[in-house]
Amino acid sequence: MIVLMAGLPGTGKTTLARELAARTSGRVLSKDEFRHSLFAAEEIEYSSRQDDFCLQIMLETAGYLLSRNSARLIFLDGRPFSRRYQIENVLAVASSLHQPWRILECVCSEETARRRLEWDAASGTHAAGNRNYQLYLEVKARFEAIRSRKTVIDTDLGIEVCVQSAMKSVNH
C-alpha cells in the first residue's frame, strides 16, 4: 500500500509516518532525504521541478520495494502534496502497481506548526533548509484542497490518537 503523508509544513507528517512505519514494518520514503542523497548542497534548489524529480525517484523506489513485498506499507513523506497533480501522479503509479493507496492529511493549529518549525530550525533536526514558518504561510496560500478520499488527522491531539486514527485508515 502507498500512503501519502499530506499537509502543511510542521503539521507532523514525518513524526506520524515514522511511528506508523515502526509499528507496521513499513518504510518511509522522504523527499528531503532523497534530495540530499541525490544532489550536492550547491545543487539543491527547493524548486517544484526538483521536488517532482525526487518524487518520481521515490515512486520508482516504492515500486521496487512493493515488487519484493506487495503487502508492505510505503509512506511517502517530505512533500505537502499541496497540488492536485502531485496526488494524481502518485495515485496513477499506485494503480499501475495494482496497489491500494491512502491519503493521511495532517493538520494542526497554526501556533503548533509555528512552534514545531521554530524548534526544528533551532535544533537543526530537519533536512530541508527552506522549512520555516514563512514556507508554511506560502504553501498554505496555494494549497489546493484534497478532493480524493482522505483521512484528516489532527496532530494537536497527540501521537497515540493520531496513530490510532491512521491505523484505522490503512487497515480499512
What spans do the regions from the language model cover?
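Small-molecule kinase domains that catalyze NTP-dependent phosphoryl transfer to phosphate-bearing small molecules
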Residues: A122-S165
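Conserved glycine(s) of the Walker
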Residues: G12
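Walker A (P-loop) ATP-phosphate-binding motif of ABC ATPase nucleotide-binding domains
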Residues: I2
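Conserved phosphate-donor/acceptor-positioning beta-strand/loop module used by diverse small-molecule
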Residues: S95-L117
